[in-house]
A protein has these predicted regions:
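Iron-sulfur (Fe-S) cluster-binding segments and ferredoxin-like electron-carrier domains
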Residues: 31-32, 45-81, 160-164
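Ferredoxin-like iron-sulfur electron-transfer modules
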Residues: 25-37, 60-61, 65-68, 89-116, ...
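Glycine- and other small-residue-rich loops at beta-strand/loop junctions that grip anionic moieties
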Residues: 20, 41-42, 66
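Cys/His-coordinated zinc-binding microdomains
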Residues: 41-44, 53-56, 118-121, 125-128, ...
Length: 217
């Protein structure tokens, strides 16, 4: 089994990657490696890039739906599948002339307007936002994936987006591996919270809701 699939977070158990043959696992891992790991859900898979990669291979889902990856990622996946290139799902962000992908973005919180509600913290798939109740929150720009999942959670609209220089191609694999690891760490942390019977808290995120559903099934 590819190393990426060793001891995956519980949320991914339903993918049943461990019962697939090695060739299938390898293809899923290769497609997942091509995806930008923003975990944005714009492909239709709210639980991240790996479920999308799995759906492409096992269920024949369209391989051109990664919005932040743009045409380069759509073409890379087409090559892995030995299929023709398809136009990438369009992005609202302009195409960067250097990377040929949609412009990379990051989020920033306007501190003077933040009310410290903590809702954006639970929405972040890579734990890039820190803060406590009634205190100003901060986003670590180097960790932010630009997924925009924090925006709709903010009751006072104090989160802005701004473009950044594209990640150099040589640095992209390491960046994506780091984002994947952070997302998996986030899932495991939420899993521990869900399983903490003594300090049970209300469900506050999509991930927690899905984990609760998994426990019931």
């Amino acid at each position: 089994m590819p190393v990426e699939f060793d001891r995956l977070p519980v949320l991914f158990a339903r993918l049943q990657l461990n019962v697939q043959d090695i060739a299938t696992q390898t293809q899923i891992a290769a497609i997942d490696a091509a995806l930008p790991q923003t975990q944005c859900g714009l492909c239709g898979h709210a639980d991240g890039c790996l479920p999308y990669a799995t759906a492409i291979v096992l269920h024949g889902e369209p391989y051109n739906q990664c919005v932040p990856g743009g045409q380069p990622v759509a073409d890379a996946i087409a090559a892995l599948l030995n299929k023709p290139n398809l136009p990438a799902k369009p992005s609202k962000w302009a195409t960067d002339p250097v990377s040929d992908r949609p412009s990379e973005i990051r989020a920033i919180i306007r501190g003077d307007d933040c009310i410290g509600c903590t809702k954006c913290i639970t929405a972040c798939p890579v734990d890039a936002i820190i803060g406590s109740g009634k205190q100003m929150h901060t986003i670590f720009a180097d960790w932010c994936t630009g997924c925009e999942l924090c925006l709709p959670t903010c009751p006072v609209d104090c989160i802005d987006l701004y473009p950044v220089a594209p990640t150099p191609a040589a640095e992209r694999p390491a960046q994506q591996a780091d984002l994947r690891a952070r997302y998996h760490a986030h899932l495991r942390r939420v899993e521990r919270q869900v399983n903490d019977q003594q300090n049970a808290q209300p469900v506050v995120s999509m991930v927690q809701a899905k984990l609760n559903d998994s426990k019931v099934q």
